[in-house]
Amino acid sequence: MKRTLMAFLLLGGLALAQADGAKIYAQCAGCHQQNGQGIPGAFPPLAGHVAEILAKEGGREYLILVLLYGLQGQIEVKGMKYNGVMSSFAQLKDEEIAAVLNHIATAWGDAKKVKGFKPFTAEEVKKLRAKKLTPQQVLAERKKLGLK
């Protein structure tokens, strides 16, 4: 009984965080679209690409860094090149960044494509907030992952 209650509470908390993440994602949807498909040539898709990032060693950290510090420079996603700027969302609380990352990792099925996916936590975000990177340095982190 206690285990069932504990599982219910934990899953309920994750569902609440995802609901908050969906609300926060509304700030992202103007560029990346509500369905995560992006706008070809202008704003890269998140759906499908988040799983590719999460599968890489260091991918979780990279996603957090993108939200904290932004991203600037040319990238390639699904064979299409994008050369723009993603603004920082450092004004969000650590819990909010974790929530929106959990949303983009689960909303379009990407988490199911990554073996052993674990939800992002505010503690992970807090730890990386101390790094103080530029958007260009975040781009360099992307390249270290082997992503274009």
Curated annotation (Swiss-Prot):
TM ranges: none
Modification type Pyrrolidone carboxylic acid: residues: Q18
Signal peptide residues on this chain, from the entry's feature table: 1-17
Top-level taxon of origin: Bacteria
Post-translational modification: Binds 1 heme c group covalently per subunit.
Keywords: Electron transport, Heme, Iron, Metal-binding, Pyrrolidone carboxylic acid, Signal, Transport
UniProt-recorded Gene Ontology molecular function terms: electron transfer activity; heme binding; metal ion binding
Residues engaged in binding heme c: C28, C31, H32, M86
Function: This monoheme basic protein appears to function as an electron donor to cytochrome oxidase in T.thermophilus.
Protein name according to UniProt: Cytochrome c-552
Organism: Thermus thermophilus (strain ATCC 27634 / DSM 579 / HB8)
